């Protein structure tokens, strides 16, 4: 047994404390959080933190944790960061009694890999506050439980806290994850700040808290699809064919080079456009540049603007990053009358007061200081910045730019700030990308962000899986109806180019938008390849929560639901329950994700497949439900694409019977109301 395995099995040290670890200034750290707790609540926060440790250590740890709470607004327990390097190892290197649990351990470590995580030492994976655990004691204890558990047990995870191992059975999930599940009346931003500071709840974002983040590749594909289809909309509106050749030279302007938003420059390159992405955090910008995800860094607008003009004129495929405030960028583009084709934003506006958005007129360092020391002044600065932000976008939109909200609460927070973002009827001036693109073209037809991770961590296994997937999609395309041929063609192109685009950051993983038929056939083929030894180790199947069925989010995933049910969350809850008893290895359900705490309910799953007949059964049963639950809900909302998809699925699957909506002549309804 090596030191890595010994440290995992040791869990939380019981005999001797590890030495305090120096604060590493070479990595990106979370900003200081709001000082929100009362004096008595701070006492409670310390008591809550100390309950993980034997009483003999409390006198030494209490002042240390109190200082962390004062300095950072949270108790992270930095001392307990493990001594080993953090990355996903091949499955056979983990100490375990359950191979399924070993796979989960690898997925957890991939989330925390410094190449992958946004603020790894604060256990924040992406989005400024998307946490996998609240503190390092929770990480250590969880890894110990996973190493010790059998396939007859289930680990319950309460917002990062491992509540314990409970007896179950081999077909039950090995882990059930909940994040941020609070009583609905206590789901405001300050509630999260308070509960998180107390150590009793966390914001798990989506794949951050559910052990399914695969680095920026996870969103590159969705962003590529979005940018390409937005470009097609623009070209079509101009009477031009939506070909890749015609997209060259188009200008896409946006913001954010963080964990999720860092995908935008790569997506722009794959789509073949000129992209300009603003990022105020120099460390984040440099990280994406060093990883090869953005081509050029520019700190001066006087240098950037001529470079943009030249790139557009030469129809280059290039990604430019502006290291500065996005409002300054938008205002300069408007002042110079630069013809922007596509505009969006991926600042973390789901978290506007705690590092998700930095106001114009302040340096990054000044904003961090104001955020912690003058929170109300910071809030007003953010609101004023959003008003200017929207004003510049409106000027460029009047000149023909197509702007879309990328599901980060930009429209929502801008409206709350009093920006000119609403139409006279109270609706938003700009669409969500789900309303215009992902909803009608992808989700309604059952296409969503299916993904897999090779537990061998061997690139050759990933290459083999790519080959299998593309062959299955090409076969599906042969008999596919016209409505989904475009989606299949885009995804065939994606997977064929994936290796050349160097998308892997962290684990050997791939994402691919596929429908129920595609996901199931691909997964079964993977399982057969494992069985035959063509793929050398198990594979983890999963998806982003940003999918057909997993998320109820009225300002994003379900923004194209128009029957009045977009503020309900039955679909997401039904989904996680159904996945849990149909063969998922782990399931998760979260409050928040994408648009923010209190605005969303979202869930996900992971499934370990190992070449067994049980894996075949789990694939067939669970993936079918995981997609068709959402199609059924969307078809009941009378979404045309979903109605087509569910009727096709009922023809393909005789055991499926879905309640079908009858359409009404609106004139009959209006007349009935008028005659009352």
Go through the PLM ranges and name each one.
Residues 319-347, 354:
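Active-site/ligand-binding-proximal alpha/beta "capping" segment
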Residues 269-271, 334-338, 419-422, 530-531, ...:
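Short, solvent-exposed amphipathic alpha-helical segments in soluble enzyme
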Residues 251-254, 318-322, 404:
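Short catalytic-loop micro-motif centered on adjacent basic/acidic residues
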Residues 539, 543-574:
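Small-residue-enriched alpha-helical segments and adjacent helix-cap loops
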Residues 274, 339, 402:
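Residue-level detector of anion-binding/catalytic polar loops
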Residues 1-196, 201-209, 375-525, 529-542, ...:
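Long, compositionally biased, glycine/small-hydrophobic-enriched stretches that function as flexible linkers
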Residues 282, 324-327, 346-351, 407-413, ...:
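Glycine-rich beta-alpha junction loops
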Residues 204-225, 232, 239-243, 248-251, ...:
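Catalytic or ion-translocation cores adjacent to nucleophile or general acid/base/metal-coordination motifs
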